[in-house]
């Protein structure tokens, strides 16, 4: 990397090159430690390690943690596997926290972005398709992993500067599927669409009180995930996921700017069975809808999140 960054130079001052160093695979914290130490031990701190980003690579495998030959079906899975998949998706929070803590030792001002270069569910390819093309279906399980992960990224946006779901169309946890001249939107597409209002906005501090969980044993994880932002016009966006297959969740959103009055201008959601997915024959099984299960309160808004 030192050789690379030496010869890749900023020739256009108004178009700076962002240099991203190859970072850890999943939980290889020693790699992060050695990379940061190597660069900062021989570099003026103002140059933040001669890098603008450090990559992080993590996929969610539904059935096995390390056997890439048995990843599990994209559409045919049990409730136990559903929660196991969500718990493995939730591991992204720990990865960001622990790699971020190491980066903080050397880069407390967070000049170096953590670049999550590949993330998402990686399941078995669809039967009858070319294994090399990595074509898989996309269900409400994918949507919840996407929503949970994007909320995690949002809440760590001071360190996570870029993240790339793998991949956009027809490969792994994609947002679109095509067949010739046909194209359908996946449940993951709608998650990205609903969360678009966070783009360009400022993150607001938020937290959940109550501690409800879903799953059990090693697959237990928080029931609700959230993130909140405010745009330049003062519009606040709140995104929430309910990871439960069984029960809805009442959430009383309290906004703390004293004296301000808030009302809901738009509310959208998706829901469906855990294996609900769109096909070319039925392209709108999972679709974005108007959300009406809310009421304005003196301090914000109260919502009832449906189960998956």
Stretches with model-predicted labels:
Residues 15-16, 49-50, 159, 263, ...:
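Short loop/turn motifs at secondary-structure junctions
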Residues 58, 167, 271:
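Residues that line or immediately flank small-molecule/substrate-binding pockets and catalytic motifs
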Residues 68, 111-235:
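Aromatic/acidic polysaccharide-binding cleft in carbohydrate-active enzymes
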Residues 1-147, 209-219:
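Noncatalytic carbohydrate-binding groove/subsite architecture in carbohydrate-active enzymes
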Residues 20-21, 55, 115-116, 164, ...:
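Structured core elements
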Residues 64, 173, 248:
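Glycine/Thr-rich phosphate-binding loops of Rossmann-like dinucleotide-binding domains
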Residues 207-221, 233, 241-308:
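C-terminal beta-sandwich/jelly-roll accessory domains of carbohydrate-active enzymes
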């Amino acid at each position: 990397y030192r050789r690379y960054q030496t010869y890749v130079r900023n020739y256009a001052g108004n178009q700076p090159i962002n240099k991203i160093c190859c970072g850890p695979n999943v939980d290889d914290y020693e790699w992060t430690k050695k990379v940061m130490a190597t660069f900062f031990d021989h570099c003026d701190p103002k140059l933040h390690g001669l890098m603008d980003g450090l990559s992080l690579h993590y996929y969610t495998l539904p059935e096995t943690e390390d056997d890439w030959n048995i990843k599990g079906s994209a559409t045919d899975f049990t409730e136990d596997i559903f929660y196991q998949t969500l718990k493995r998706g939730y591991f992204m929070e720990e990865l960001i926290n622990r790699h971020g803590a190491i980066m903080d030792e050397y880069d407390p001002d967070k000049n170096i972005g953590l670049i999550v270069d590949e993330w998402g569910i990686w399941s078995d390819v669809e039967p009858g398709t070319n294994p090399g093309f990595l074509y898989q279906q996309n269900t409400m399980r994918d949507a919840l992993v996407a929503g949970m992960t994007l909320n995690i990224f949002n809440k760590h946006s001071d360190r996570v500067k870029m993240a790339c779901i793998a991949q956009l169309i027809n490969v792994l946890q994609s947002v679109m599927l095509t067949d010739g001249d046909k194209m359908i939107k996946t449940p993951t597409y709608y998650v990205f669409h609903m969360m678009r209002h966070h783009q360009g906005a400022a993150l607001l501090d938020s937290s959940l009180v109550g501690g409800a969980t879903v799953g059990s044993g090693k697959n237990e994880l928080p029931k609700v995930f959230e993130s909140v932002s405010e745009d330049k016009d003062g519009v606040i966006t709140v995104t929430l996921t309910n990871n439960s297959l069984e029960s809805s969740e009442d959430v009383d959103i309290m906004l703390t700017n004293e004296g301000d009055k808030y009302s809901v201008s738009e509310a959208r959601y998706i829901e469906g069975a855990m294996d609900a997915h769109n096909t070319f024959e039925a392209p709108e099984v999972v679709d974005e809808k108007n959300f009406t299960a809310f009421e304005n309160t003196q301090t914000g808004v109260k919502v009832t999140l449906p189960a998956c």
